[in-house]
């Protein structure tokens, strides 16, 4: 086998840390050509050389330029930021509790207990919580009287921009929560980014230089967490 056509180093993924756990040569990709003639050996070497060239081009396209081959901490600017889907929570309705809240003066956010009396042009005057007229800035929960006039249901379920029939179950309501982080994530990378960043490495003439120049990540017993090689000081 030609030494000028090395076997690529396959990276392994450390899911707990989101880092590459090291790399090792994939000897299973070698072809058995020990009994082949010069022509077959040349064809095998041609296939291997083409494979290495494809890997080099892929790494140049998808890998992020970085000074360290396997950084222990990826900055937020280089980490794929995922936008999780909203979370929908089912909230049970409690009409009795809502009646108690209304009788205690509870209102939806932005409401006001000052109501203009019918036919009066004087300034707002304080009055009971429940009235037949709603003046836009708040609604009361479980008001059976006003629900028929304004399209509000007595169980508190209402719609914006219309008063059509609601499809909600009277005893249920849904709350949608947006699951998003307040700060961009940093540290480890996900599986999709790992596949793009750590393309199988083609390392030419690995044993021709000084031992200190050989990447530690290519040593089989390299520990990505401690950034050391087991058995070496």
Swiss-Prot record:
One Gene Ontology term of the molecular function aspect: hexon binding
Site (Cleavage): 111-112, 163-164
Modified residues (Phosphoserine): 180
InterPro entries: Adeno_PVIII (IPR000646)
Positions of modified residues (Phosphothreonine): 64
UniProt modification remark: Cleaved by the viral protease during virion maturation. May cause the middle segment to be shed from the capsid.
Short name of any one Pfam family annotated for the protein: Adeno_PVIII
Cellular component aspect of the GO annotation: host cell nucleus; viral capsid
Gene3D superfamilies for this protein: 6.10.250.1460
UniProt key word Phosphoprotein: yes
Keyword Ribosomal protein in annotation: no
Signal peptide: none
Propeptide intervals in chain numbering: 112-163
Disulfide bonds: none
Coiled coil segments of this chain: none
UniProt keyword terms in alphabetical order: Capsid protein, Host nucleus, Late protein, Phosphoprotein, Virion
Swiss-Prot/TrEMBL induction comment: Expressed in the late phase of the viral replicative cycle.
Anything else known: All late proteins expressed from the major late promoter are produced by alternative splicing and alternative polyadenylation of the same gene giving rise to non-overlapping ORFs. A leader sequence is present in the N-terminus of all these mRNAs and is recognized by the viral shutoff protein to provide expression although conventional translation via ribosome scanning from the cap has been shut off in the host cell.
Assembly, per entry: Interacts with the peripentonal hexons as well as the hexons in the facets. Part of a complex composed of the core-capsid bridging protein, the endosome lysis protein VI and the hexon-linking protein VIII; these interactions bridge the virus core to the capsid.
Family membership noted in the UniProt record: Belongs to the adenoviridae hexon-linking protein family.
HAMAP family hit by this protein: ADV_CAP8
Protein name: Pre-hexon-linking protein VIII
Gene name of the encoded protein: L4
């Amino acid at each position: 086998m030609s030494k000028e056509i090395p076997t690529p180093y396959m990276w392994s993924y450390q899911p707990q840390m989101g880092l590459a756990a090291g790399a090792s040569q994939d000897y299973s990709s070698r072809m058995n050509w020990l009994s082949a003639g010069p022509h077959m050996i040349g064809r095998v070497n041609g296939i291997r050389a083409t494979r290495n060239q494809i890997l080099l081009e892929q790494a140049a396209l998808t890998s992020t330029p970085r000074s360290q081959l396997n950084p222990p901490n990826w900055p937020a600017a280089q980490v794929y930021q995922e936008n999780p889907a909203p979370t929908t929570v089912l909230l049970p309705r409690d009409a009795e509790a809502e009646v108690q809240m209304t009788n205690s003066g509870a209102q939806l956010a932005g409401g006001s207990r000052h109501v203009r009396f019918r036919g009066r042009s004087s300034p707002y005057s304080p009055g009971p919580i429940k009235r037949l007229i709603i003046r836009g800035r708040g609604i009361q929960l479980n008001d059976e009287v006003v629900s028929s006039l304004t399209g509000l249901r007595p169980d508190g379920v209402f719609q914006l921009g219309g008063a059509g029939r609601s499809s909600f179950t009277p005893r249920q309501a849904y709350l949608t929560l947006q699951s998003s982080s307040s700060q961009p994530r940093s540290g480890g990378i996900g599986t999709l980014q790992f596949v793009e960043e750590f393309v199988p490495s083609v390392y030419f003439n690995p044993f021709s230089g000084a031992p200190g120049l050989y990447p530690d990540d290519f040593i089989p017993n390299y520990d990505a967490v401690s950034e050391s090689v087991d058995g070496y000081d």
